[in-house]
């Protein structure tokens, strides 16, 4: 009998996805949500803000939940938003462009700039579309051509995701199910064959949490 923490919780989310010792979790998640395959797959990540237990109960230790770069120098920002903050859209653009501009010091170095991808997991409805997963990029409004490929945004809207265990088809379905429903489960679903997702369930199992970490989770 396994009980899982609420993955949407601030401490839980960062402990699972920002875990220095379990990078396979973040790597699998990024590849799934961004649909990266073959040569484009993320193979290794460097966490720019690895998870640390808050020093004080209820303290938020970082503004952004997870920031990482891969071996190609691409930056990934992953955020779990339980409630819609004021100026949400501007906040997303602010952190994405800050990470983009922050890569170089002088204007001569433009060719060195590497892409920044933002993944937002939202526990509220934000976009008009019905699909729980949406992709946003800078496009030519007439032709749909994506001329500025370095900034990409993916959003998972949990309220629009209502699939049951037997309906989980894609790996993104399975990750979204984990984030939304893990706390309600007694055991890991049967059809989980992805190494990173298996590790994520293990990491979310309450019996793998120290007293100190669990206290931080409860009080966050």
Label every PLM stretch briefly.
Residues 1-220:
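Elongated, amphipathic alpha-helical interaction scaffolds
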């Amino acid at each position: 009998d396994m009980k899982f923490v609420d993955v949407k919780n601030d401490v839980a989310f960062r402990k699972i996805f920002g875990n220095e010792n379990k990078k396979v979790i973040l790597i699998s998640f990024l590849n799934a949500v961004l649909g990266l395959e073959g040569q484009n797959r993320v193979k290794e990540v460097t966490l720019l803000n690895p998870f640390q237990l808050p020093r004080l109960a209820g303290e938020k230790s970082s503004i952004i939940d997870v920031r990482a770069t891969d071996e190609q120098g691409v930056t990934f920002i992953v955020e779990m938003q339980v409630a819609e903050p004021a100026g949400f859209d501007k906040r997303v653009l602010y952190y994405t462009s800050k990470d983009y501009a922050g890569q170089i010091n002088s204007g001569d170095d433009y060719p060195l700039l590497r892409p920044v991808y933002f993944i937002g997991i939202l526990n509220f409805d934000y976009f008009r579309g019905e699909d729980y997963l949406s992709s946003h990029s800078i496009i030519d409004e007439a032709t749909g051509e994506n001329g500025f490929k370095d900034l990409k945004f993916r959003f998972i809207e949990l309220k629009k995701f209502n699939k049951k265990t037997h309906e989980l088809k894609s790996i993104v379905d399975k990750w979204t199910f984990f984030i939304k429903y893990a706390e309600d489960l007694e055991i890991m679903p049967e059809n989980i064959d992805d190494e990173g997702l298996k590790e994520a369930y293990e990491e979310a199992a309450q019996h793998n949490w120290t007293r100190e970490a669990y206290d931080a989770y409860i009080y966050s």
